[in-house]
Amino acid sequence: DVAVCENAGDVAETREFAAEGSDAVAVGCDGVAALLCFADCAPVIIVAPSGKFAVAHCGWRGVVYGAWATALSTLCELTGEPPERFNVYIGPYIHACHFEVGEEVAKQFFDSFGEASLVDERHVDMGAALRCGFASMGVAPERIADVDMCTVCDAGERFYSYRASGGTCGRHGAFAARILG
């Protein structure tokens, strides 16, 4: 589910809805910020030409089951704008070099995104899957920016990593706001 805030007066209600398990927040008004927290999952920020935006939390389930796609579709509905005009920013996440998964998860990635999402039969590339998914929905590849930073490779230095810490760690955040000036 995507929590949607269409006016500043709805912030408390949107926050409450998001806290019940939303994987994304879409903001369609000025003066409202969104913050989602991450460890190894991919933060995704989608921005429409109007300045309306969505922030999505994309762990492997969020990638495979389409939290990013639901956020994009919600933003398209909110703005009336087509996806080819949107910009997508993918923040730091666990890269394939450290993201070894079971056969069932690898199959789900392959079935959803094809060969590009797998480095080998046990290592998943969430960034490639996200880029492929956004492109399949009409977002131009040149409008998709991936910071290409691994949370495990930089654990403790720049980022928190659930996997690198053995399950005990802090979180880093993806913050988005529309500032008028």
Feature annotation, model-predicted:
Residues D1-G181:
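Active-site microenvironment for binding and transforming phosphate-containing groups
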